[in-house]
Regions:
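Chalcogenol-based redox active-site neighborhoods
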Residues: 1-158
């Protein structure tokens, strides 16, 4: 998928500062000590698989919230595109714009020759360590959507 290093379970999660669809900037560090963070990298807004994936995550949102976890979708799309995308598919959790590709690179999921990230999920605990991760090798396959049930199981064990 990439030539960058993907942070492993147990390692510190890279911080980020990304603009949400509402124009607000979000950082990982502002949640440390308070909430777990689930980062769901998706290739592109309005693409067929992403349009299927994110509503599934929206349906699971109450379970993540009950586990004291904030959820963010992350793509290289502009925050305006993410706002329109969120409205069109009924997603209420923040979709963050990685316009400069810095977060995608830091998490090792940027596909340089395509200019967007692969499909990947990282669960970061309250101490800022990666508790669980799943990387999809095929960004265009619905079967390769990361198993978020596994993320919930990792939270239950933590």
């Amino acid at each position: 998928m990439q030539t960058m290093t993907i942070p492993d379970v147990g390692q510190a999660a890279p911080d980020f500062r990304l603009r949400g669809a509402d124009g607000t900037f979000y950082t990982l560090s502002e949640y440390l000590g308070d909430q777990n963070v689930l980062l769901v990298f998706y290739p592109l807004a309005f693409s067929p698989v992403c349009t299927h994936q994110l509503p599934e995550l929206q349906a699971m949102l109450p379970r993540f919230e009950a586990a004291d976890t904030v959820v963010f979708g992350v793509s290289v799309d502009s925050h305006w595109s993410n706002a329109a995308f969120a409205r069109s598919i009924g997603v209420r959790f923040p979709l963050l714009s990685d316009w400069k590709r810095e977060a995608s690179a830091a998490y090792g999921v940027l596909i340089p020759d395509k200019g967007y990230s692969g499909r990947a999920s990282f669960l970061v605990d309250k101490q800022g360590r990666i508790l669980w991760r799943e990387i999809s090798e095929n960004t265009g396959s619905i079967e390769e959507i990361p198993s978020l049930e596994a993320a919930l199981a990792a939270l239950a064990k933590a």
